[in-house]
Regions:
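PLP-dependent enzyme catalytic core of the Aspartate aminotransferase-like
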Residues: 1, 7, 16, 83, ...
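Short, Lys/Arg-enriched N-terminal segments with co-localized hydrophobic residues
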Residues: 12-22
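N-terminal "arm"/small-domain region of PLP-dependent enzymes with the aminotransferase-like
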Residues: 35-96, 229
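Active-site phosphate-binding strand-loop segment of PLP-dependent enzymes
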Residues: 75, 175, 179-233
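Short loop-beta-helix segment that forms the pyridoxal 5′-phosphate
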Residues: 103-109, 117-141
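Conserved PLP-anchoring active-site segment centered on the Schiff-base-forming lysine
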Residues: 142-161
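Active-site C-terminal subdomain of aminotransferase-like
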Residues: 227-230, 237, 242-348
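Conserved PLP-binding catalytic core of the aspartate aminotransferase-like
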Residues: 324-331, 338-373, 383, 387-388, ...
Length: 419
């Protein structure tokens, strides 16, 4: 009997009444998933992939030879193809090797890992930092480590999926407050007190990336002080360029030193590679090193990424030129869109969603923009709520005003073509 025919064989099992039931065949099981994907396509929600062959940059070269202006990367500081970082990575490969083949507490800690943790702590003004394979892992390994069934987590309704999943893993009581709504946050803090929570932790994104809205972190910290709660911020879409010196949402909101836990990524503005971190109070970081499962059971950050990241933070401390240019080009782009009648969410962040609402319209709009030479992607359910489809555009420091003019011109042309 072949392996496939064994899969297709109808098996039998007994139910709780002792009756024999037929089990679904393997093909029947797999057809469930096929139908699910077909439904996604029919609803206009299918997320495809468009491979490119060049480094990530303001422009990318596609497999078919086309060169597109990239307007959808998290490459905020334009460092994905930076020669200085590439050279630092090459140098680290020569000095430290390709990988460490171990977790941190066995034999996976090199000196550059400790140096990078110290460098991040110094940049953010925190006590200590712990590195992860990604920020998703940082968030996934946070809540179950520091919260128990006696505690409560109060989470913004628009938090990133990694926070949502991380909260699901812990046994703490869960409260969700309306996006950036301080009145509702206070109500949930009161509910947590009434429930007898021992520790209260407020969890929020620093920037809500689907909308480009910056968190009211001062309001969050004020309420945390009032109700004796800890504050956790995922600053993945902020560190490196938000705030006068790029130190993130806490700097932007004037609450440096008042945030207990900052999680973030090395995979967006900070070079665009991979890796994450949790930075904050020493007592919390110490416990994470002992108990956080993604840290204990995942390989250490690749040496080349650690080495290049050290170089990156040196660059950020030397000059704010990149974030200053990004701020200027973002303001120009936002004004051009508004002046030409596009529906965008007001703000200052370089993540600028162009609202189209209908899922199929957004998908077709993105397709036509690609045909005109602009790489954008339609965002639809479940990434955003149903009926809130959009083209999420993202400015980077390597864009020029001429690039912005071309992008807006293409937006206008596609709008006219689609009526």
């Amino acid at each position: 009997m072949t392996k496939k025919s064994a899969w297709n064989k109808v098996g039998k099992r007994q139910n709780k009444n002792g009756e024999v039931e037929k089990m679904a065949r393997k093909d029947d099981i797999l057809s469930i998933y096929t139908k699910e994907v077909e439904g996604i396509k029919e609803a206009g929600l299918f997320k495809g992939e468009a491979p490119f062959v060049s480094p990530q940059g303001a422009r990318v070269k596609m497999e078919d030879g086309r060169e597109l202006l990239c307007m959808c990367a998290n490459n905020y500081l334009g460092l994905g193809d930076n020669p200085r970082l590439i050279e630092a990575a090459k140098r680290t490969y020569d000095e430290k090797g390709y990988g460490v083949a171990s977790v941190r507490f066995i034999c996976g800690t090199q000196d550059i890992h400790k140096k990078l943790e110290k460098k991040i702590s110094g940049f953010l003004g925190t006590d200590d930092t712990i590195l992860y394979s990604s920020c998703f892992d940082a968030n996934g390994g946070l809540f179950e480590t520091i919260l128990t069934a006696e505690d409560a987590v109060i989470s913004d309704e628009l938090n990133h999926a990694s926070i949502i999943d991380g909260v699901r893993l812990c046994k703490a009581k869960r409260f969700r407050y309306k996006n950036n709504d301080m009145k509702d946050l206070e109500a949930k803090l009161k509910e947590a007190d009434e429930a007898g929570a021992r520790i209260k932790l407020i969890a929020t994104d620093g920037v809500f990336s689907m909308d480009g809205i910056i968190c009211n972190l001062k309001g969050v910290c004020d309420l945390a002080d009032k109700y004796n709660a800890l504050v956790m911020v995922d600053d993945s879409h902020a560190v490196g360029f938000v705030g006068k010196t790029g130190r993130g949402t806490a700097e932007y909101c004037g609450v440096e030193g008042r945030v207990d836990i900052i999680t973030g990524t090395l995979g967006k503005a900070l070079g665009g590679a991979s890796g994450g971190y949790t930075s904050g109070r020493k007592e919390i970081i110490d416990l994470l090193r002992q108990r956080s499962r993604p840290y204990l059971f995942s390989n250490s950050l690749a040496p080349a990424i650690a080495g290049a990241s050290l170089e990156l933070f040196d660059m950020l401390e030397e000059s704010t030129e990149l974030r200053d240019h990004l701020e200027e080009v973002t303001a120009y782009y936002r004004k051009q869109l508004v002046d030409n009648g596009f529906d965008i969410i007001p703000g200052t962040h370089p993540c600028v969603p162009v609202m189209l609402y209908d899922e199929k319209t957004a998908a077709e709009f993105a397709k036509r923009m690609m045909e005109k030479g602009v790489y954008v992607v339609a965002f639809s359910y479940p990434v955003v709520p149903k009926g809130k489809a959009r083209i999420r555009t993202q400015v980077c420091a390597s864009h020029t005003k001429e690039d912005i003019d071309f992008i807006v011109k293409c937006f206008i042309e596609v709008r006219e073509e689609m009526g």
